[in-house]
Amino acid sequence: MASISDDGMALSGYLKKLKTMKKKFFVLYEETSHSAARLEYYDSEKKFLQRAEPKRVIYLKNCFNINRRLDTKHRFVIVLSSRDGGFGIVLENENDLRKWLDKLLVLQRNIANSNGTAHSPYDQVWQVVIQKKGISEKVGITGTYHCCLTSKSLTFVCIGPEKTPNGEDRVASIEILLTTIRRCGHASPQCIFYVELGRQSVLGSGDLWMETDNAAVATNMHNTILSAMSAKTESNTNLINVYQNRPDLSHEPMRKRSSSANEASKPINVNVIQNSQNSLEFRSCSSPHNYGFGRERCDSLPTRNGTLSESSNQTYFGSNHGLRSNTISGNRPHSTNKHSNSPTFTMPLRCSESEESSISVEESDDNGSYSHYRLNTRTSETAIPEENIDDFASAEFSKVTEPNESDENYIPMTPINPTDAIHEKEKIDMQRLEDASLHFDFPEHASEKLAKDYDLDSDNQCVRPIRAYSIGNKVEHLKFNKRLGHLNDTGQNPNRVRAYSVGSKSKIPRCDLQRVVLVEDNKHEFVANRSQSSITKEGSGYGTSGNRQKKSTSAPLLSLKNQINSDRMSDLMEIDFSQASNLEKQKFIKNNEIPKYIENVFPKTPRTDSSSLTLHATSQKDIFNGTKLNNTANTSEDGYLEMKPVGNAYTPSSNCLPIKVEKLKLSDYTAPLTTAAPVHDLNKISTYNISAEKWREQTTSEEKKSNSPLNEKPFSLKPTNVENISHDVHSTNNIDCEQVSVQSDKQNNLDDKIVENNNLDIGGHEEKKLVHSISSEDYTQIKDKSNDFTKFNEAGYKILQIKSDSSLISSKLYQKGIHKDNLERSHRLTESVNTIPDNATASSSVTKFNINAKAADSRSTDPSTPQNILQIKDLNFPSRSSSRISQPELHYASLDLPHCSGQNPAKYLKRGSRESPPVSACPEDGNTYAKIDFDQSDSSSSSSNIFNT
């Protein structure tokens, strides 16, 4: 080392350049009368002694900052920053570092004092290259700059010329307050550091992207700037007031800075992955200038509560007041949270919720005394507890109610059992005393709104903590219940009220409607509206009378409304598994529905008693009077709802026959008929597959009708070719069919019998129905005059009974083979017609057969009797379970054949309509019965045996 000479040399020696790490001979000169303070270096000491030209001269007056640098891999580095760039010196040890750094700083201060300028050194200076990205190009900050950090601002100083090679101006120097920085981060692989500025900054809102020498510099910039943003000092607290010429308010704490950024403004290309513990240890010894840092400040990201690792492990003096860790990089061990032993503060150190900021940020110097509570800045009298109420321990807000307070704060996870009445009463009284001390004063809310939040009557509060509501939340819920008229029910019920979806409280189950409306009001007629899936009573509004049977539910049902909205039940299907009070009434209600296609034919006006629905097996009057139906099936399954498909379900014998028999119209045998589907075979037929035991019940009614005198004249029809005339009938039934057409002018006053086919599998868009021919004039007359069905003289036949010979095979009702077959084919109705062309003459006939009308008993019919049988060839009959039955099965149909007449049948029977007109027949008139044998044993060569009865 050379001593101070006459030319002002202060220090000299061999040091290393930071950039090349080569040893050079450095000489430091003080300011003299004929030279300025400067730093020179030579290649060697020999050249210095030879008075050679120095390799570089750095004047201290041009250096705006001289400090120690810690972001390099070398420990002892001094950097001199000037407008020409930065120059780094690497020393051997700490003593040399202190000696050279102190001498340089003394000389720099002397220069500032001589010039009359205040010297404000920077804590950290980094040399960066600002990229043309974000707002940098717009404001003119591009190229190489010094990034200088102080406790209150971040300054960018231009390096090099103030004009770019393109002639654009560059900003020489600009200072950005730390309070206007939203957030910062770095990308390690790309050596990129960025800063996001807010709207209150000098440059406006935007991002500044800068490139550093290496990734270590970018990491150090991020940690150091973030620590400065999170520090708390009195000077930085009152910085805004000083800049705006306001009085110094250092004795009053400044509101903690909350973030104005949200998650959407985060750059997604910034990946910061580093060890939290290493970064904390690295920052704890960053710079001696950091000793003055103390301002607590939340960073610009949406942040969270401070943890133990961010408070005690990040301190410089070992106190509880420390620096925040990097919120981007760093783990947050929440499990290490512990209550602080420090005394409670009257003024909370955490950033509270404010009206100015959209995102509230919470920071604290203590280790979580208020970690589970938020203090509302609008009032200082109470705090709203959140979920972790058992962790709250504060002398200001906690109230000691009983000695065993720890037992009350414990929340059991077992099902809550109701406590005794005395303990419950004590808790309610204690809670009312606490509620009396609560006072809320909001300009837009009444004081009693939040006072009702601690009402124990609304919920079952055995040992559970009180639920925290937002402002006005529960009050609006109570107002809604009051408008609905349920306030008294919920207030008197200590249990938890069942939660309903929107509009579900006004829904009444369909089973309750059937039970209440249809069974009790038994003197009215009912129409099942399938479009709305509800049952309504004709001539009256929607309403229920009587008591509802309470269903088994997990929560108490709320009271029902008197008015029922049918639209709300349009998308609801409920299944009632409860025991029915009267099984027979329930079965009648189930089978009393009218098909939709029958409702469309008749007008929806009130019907007279003459046109009302009648039953075949039993009458409606007998059911309402309490008459028991003959039920041969086992009744052990009463009340159980069969979940099998309707077509395959086995029902008791009382429900085997259809309750209503559809009116069938006899078309003109001289007019062509339209078919339900394109006919590929000559003769098609439809049958009823009905169990054998049902026919045993119907023998008495058939015997009575068979005794009536028959005056029918036999007639014959000649066989002709069969044509398929019309293919445009909208139906998709694949069932072979045959229709016999007979002309008649006899007026029949029989009761209407409607066949309801509930068990057919619908293969198309419209339901299967018996197809008949009716003129368009008759259809118009029916629509206009639907209440009078007895005005027309119509010819037709009615299928009174259909009997299978399965009842003749064996005397047992429940034989195994027959039971399986009847179980599969019960309630199946196949309907269709056979097309008969018109030959334009009344003498032409379709099928040749003889019908000799005479009275006979249906029970004595034997399929083996061959008298008066005409074979009809080329018939295809549907057979579903022909493999199960080894012997032929015959089906008999009792037909009501009215008297033939010479009147023109075209007056009433015409082509072109498929609806069944109303037929009124008198049971007192003489009827003709014929039994037709439909043989299903052989599908290839089937026959039809017609018996003259």
Swiss-Prot record:
InterPro entries: IRS (IPR039011), IRS_PTB (IPR002404), PH-like_dom_sf (IPR011993), PH_domain (IPR001849). It comes from the Eukaryota. Residues 247-270, 304-373, 530-556, 696-718, 906-949 are annotated as: Disordered. A motif (YXXM motif 1) lies at residues 410-413. Residues 8-109 form the PH domain. One of its GO terms (biological process) is insulin-like growth factor receptor signaling pathway. GO terms for molecular function: insulin receptor binding; insulin-like growth factor receptor binding; phosphatidylinositol 3-kinase binding. Residues 937-949 have a biased composition (Low complexity). GO terms for cellular component: cytoplasm; cytosol; intracellular membrane-bounded organelle; nucleus; plasma membrane. A motif (YXXM motif 2) lies at residues 640-643. The modification Phosphoserine is found at S286, S287, S342, S554, S913, S916. This is Insulin receptor substrate 1. It comes from Drosophila yakuba (Fruit fly).
